[in-house]
Amino acid sequence: MLLSCRHGASSPKLDNLVPSGKMKILLVFLGLLCYSAAMPMQMPRMPGFSSKSEEMMRYGHFNFMNAPHMAHLGTLYGNGMQLPQFFPQYQMPMWPQPPPNKKHPQKPSASKQQSKTDPAPESQKPNQPQPKTPTPKQPLNEPSPTPTQPEEETQTPQAFPPFGNGLFPYQQPLWHVPHRIPPGYGRPPTSNEEGGNPYFGFFGYHGFGGRPPYYSEEMFEQDFEKPKEKDPPKTETPATEPSVNTTVPETNSTQPNAPNPRGNDTSPTGTSGQGPNPRSNPTGQNGPAVNVSGQGVPRSQSPWGPRQTIIHENYPNPNIRGFPARRQWRPPGPAMGHRRNGPFYRNQQIQRGPRWNSFTLEGKQAVRPGYPTYRRVYGSTARSNPPNYAGNSANLRRKPEGPNKNPMVTNVAPPGPKHGTVDQNENIQNPREKQVSQKERTVVPTRDPSGPWRNSQDYGINKSNYKLPQPEDNMLVPNFNSIDQRENSYYPRGESKRAPNSDGQTQTQIIPKGIVLEPRRIPYESETNQPELKHSAYQPVYTEGIPSPAKEHFPAGRNTWNQQEISPPFKEDPGRQEEHLPHLSHGSRVHVYYPDYNPYDPRENSPYLRSNTWYERDDSPNTMGQPENPHYPMNTPDPKETIPYNEEDPIDPTGDEHFPGQSRWDMEELSFKEDPTVRHYEGEQYTSNQPKEYLPYSLDNPSKPREDFLYGEFYPWNPEENFPSYNTAPTVSSPVESRGYYANNAVGQEESTMFPSWSSWDPRIQAQGQKEGRPYLNRNFWDQSTNLYKTPTSSPHQKENQPYSNNSPAGLQKNPTWHEGENLNYGMQITRLNSPERDHLAFPDLIPPDYPGGQKESHVFHLSQRGPCCAGGSMWPKNNPLALQDYTQSFGLAPGENPDTSIGYAEDSHIKYARQTVSPTSIVPGQRNSSEKILPGESQNPSPFKDDVSTLRRSTPCSVKSQLSQRGIMPLPEANSLQSKNTPCLTSDLGGDGNNVLEQIFEGNQLNERTVDLTPEQLVFGTPDKEPRPEGIPNEMQGNESERQQQRQSSILQLPCFGSKLANYHTSSIGTPSSLGRQDSFDGDPIMPTETPNSLAGLATGAQFQNINVDPLNEDEHTPFDSLQIGTNPQDQVQDCLLLQA
């Protein structure tokens, strides 16, 4: 327009030009010029940085540009708050560059973006058009931009004193972006948790077109609006501040509580001191001056200026009542729901970003562990984002004006006056939330009557908060209570699902809130993801119940996990799951909490749910059977479960799919804890994860495992500290088992922990599983699931269904899926196992790469280190032959070196434990090696030795046989316990199983037969039970061993890594099948991979193995050499891995 006007001044010229046709050119030029003047923000930016850069912006090429969005997404991706901070820093140089371009002075107001964009175009276009364009642009921009600029520049220091004009352009956009984007979105830059901002984040993310327009429009508007905001805020500062002051005195009443220190400090310190808070605190910066700041709040206040006035008019009561209470309620949310509530409520309020930022800081503080911060970021994404975005956006959208404005302003205006308080509360929220938490928590119970509010206001609370200033108070309380209750009742989500209160009130609020609630509900149900970030952060707090801030501690939450996971809370949780709505807060939220820890600790989720589910299943084998069938037949539900879980796995990071997934969880668990569906989620997690999603879940969820690691470290080890190894194995290892077995066994049994799913050794499951009250769960799980699940794989196993162990060996790691594909899956999974990814895939159950550190399982599964391909030994960092193998494979260690130790250990209970623990790994390498080496023999010699050894292997999944036998775990109790552990490990013994699987793959029946023969007793009791570990069976095995060796020679390559090691382990004998298998390979050198190991094991180990293999008397030696040879076989396994991988 300016150009047109300016050129319009020379209309005669233009008229003269018109005839010559130059008018067209001029008009085109002017049009292009005007377009470039307007567009350079976008276009020059893209050209200036290149459209690729614009595309790359998502990757941070324009880190600063995407900073606002990348802040959220960055947080989602782990960039977190830092990106906005870094980006501003990065912007600092960037913006200084534009100022040198002459246009920055002009365009700071016109558009910093323009200044940046135009300078880029100028730099790019400096050739010819730019001289002209700059000239018109400068005049164009100068007329209005310059006037605007002074304000902006003047405002800029005010707005972002810390950042200065250089950063301010982006800080402004950041601020404006957050506030401009619906306040409900919270500040995306700061909303790294919100960074979730699915809407905003994605808006900015895929909104490159949207984002530059966002910048163009928003920055452009902001440039003008900011002056407007500034002017009104300046005007409002007196006007609003009086109101704010009216509120602020109240706020100050609140602020003096805890925030007062940061009330004013927050503005300088909070702004400059607090990374995210600068964005949020700039609002809180000037307490009253926040209006002047016009940054976070002024930005918001610009729109809120009138609103704030109104809100302050309306708000004094809300501020006086609702605001202090609300703030207090906020702190209770943070206090009670700490981060969760903080995120929810805070995000609700902080949707404008100040509180959110406070929450970010506070969340970081409260979620000190760091992964809670990640959780926050992540969980907030799912959880806070839905509330903030869906809920707040919905609130803003639904009630953009009346309550939304008031509450928004209440949120924002209070953040203005009370921003120091709120930010302070939130900044101080850790202190304040604890301070206010107690009293406010007390109030929250007072507000508990608004539990319906809380429930419905969980997500609707934003709306409720935004609906009514005073109910805002209650809503805040419910907001926190809702958060708390969300945490506690685990959500009005549950209640939203109940939909009486939540949906009743919330549905009004639910319209967006329904969306929000469902996503949030689902997030809460799926709060596996969100709480995964937060569940440890604060859902755990809420897991046990919002009632006590102590529950803030996720240690409490973890204890809750441990207790609930392991203790009746699970059993109690069936009721709770039925309760799930309120206690889905516990159950579902613990559910979520488990999901938090266990989105793919679904077994943890499942243990929670599944504990409920499994306990219920325990209550009703049909439920168990069915869920277990779906669980196991996860292959059956697997598509659904796999897809949902995959969705959840991928979306899981966003927590959105977790919303659905967890909604499934909670709803399904709620609905009937029909863990088939829950298992769809859990099963998705585990079912899908078993063969595939298990890896995805283990590996796919590594993000979540990282959350989960946050939880996995946090929860899996902690909640499952009972059996971290198992936990890890369950976590990753047993999608179903984690669900049912690992979850239940993991929760209920530490013995079964390791191999609860392997604990399909139903004797142990019955022993331990029964002690868990889920023996049949394991049994059903294995029996039925194995039947159903393994039925395809093992009709023989079905015949073996009698021994759940049998099936469990068959489906050792839920290997119903694997074993179902025992022929295929196992071979394939062995291949998976052979490949590092596949390692996790095949043994994700047993070897959760995610929880490599499942302290116990760290050895067992962590050997996802498992080495190159079947890194079976890696899992045995503790003197495990397999660990050696893994390491040996990785490092090519002299197999005999550590294996010797491992050998001793293999025979010792440590190695046995390690091997048991490592068994999954052992299975992987063992099965690889055993499969490739022993498998041929087994395939050819399936009936006597295979059935015995293979069954043993299968029954004693990995080294369990060797280890149990060597270890003398033959005792049923220990055999059950260790074998259970070993059994899953013997999924490593699936070396045997792997061989069996391979054999079944090759032979079909023999694995099942073997498993049928040995699994129930030999597995749990007898196979390793035979105290002459390998001697009893090993004699037979050894007898068969020669055959097997010879036979193995033919089939060596099939499961080189997977079966070879453990198969040798098992081949050596039940106790030392690995020795047998390896010795077979070593002895006859029939197996290709064995040759290299023969070279290695050709050392004493190879020869001894050969001798030992042949001699039943040498079985004990076999065990050491088995371990050693496992250690020695690492190269073998490496080769095997290569073979399998090839």
Swiss-Prot record:
Tissue-by-tissue expression: Expressed by secretory-phase ameloblasts. Intact enamelin and large-molecular-weight enamelins are limited to the most superficial layer of the developing enamel matrix, while low-molecular-weight enamelins are observed in deeper enamelin. Preferential localization among the crystallites in rod and interrod enamel.
Propeptide: 277-514, 666-669
Description of post-translational modifications: Proteolytically cleaved into several smaller polypeptides. Cleavage of N-terminal region of enamelin occurs soon after secretion.
Superkingdom of origin: Eukaryota
Positions of glycan attachment: 245, 252, 264, 291, 462, 929, 1040
MF annotations from Gene Ontology: structural constituent of tooth enamel
InterPro entries per UniProt: Enamelin (IPR015673)
Stored PANTHER family: ENAMELIN (PTHR16784:SF2)
Name the record gives this protein: Enamelin
Biased composition (Basic and acidic residues): 223-234, 431-442, 570-582
Pfam families listed in its UniProt record: Enamelin
GO terms of biological process kind: ameloblast differentiation; amelogenesis; biomineral tissue development; positive regulation of enamel mineralization
Function comment: Involved in the mineralization and structural organization of enamel. Involved in the extension of enamel during the secretory stage of dental enamel formation.
Keyword hit for DNA damage: no
Organism phylogeny: Eukaryota, Metazoa, Chordata, Craniata, Vertebrata
Keyword annotations: Biomineralization, Extracellular matrix, Glycoprotein, Hydroxylation, Phosphoprotein, Secreted, Signal
Signal sequence region: 1-38
Biased composition (Polar residues): 243-303, 381-395, 453-467, 787-816, 952-965
Compositionally biased spans, kind Pro residues: 128-148
Localisation: Secreted, Extracellular space, Extracellular matrix
Residues with PTM Phosphoserine: 53, 191, 216
Gene Ontology CC entries for this record: extracellular matrix; extracellular region
Keyword Oxidoreductase: no
Chain positions covered by the region annotation Disordered: 90-347, 374-513, 543-587, 603-662, 787-820, 921-965, 1020-1049
Chief location bin: secreted
Modification sites for Hydroxyproline: 547
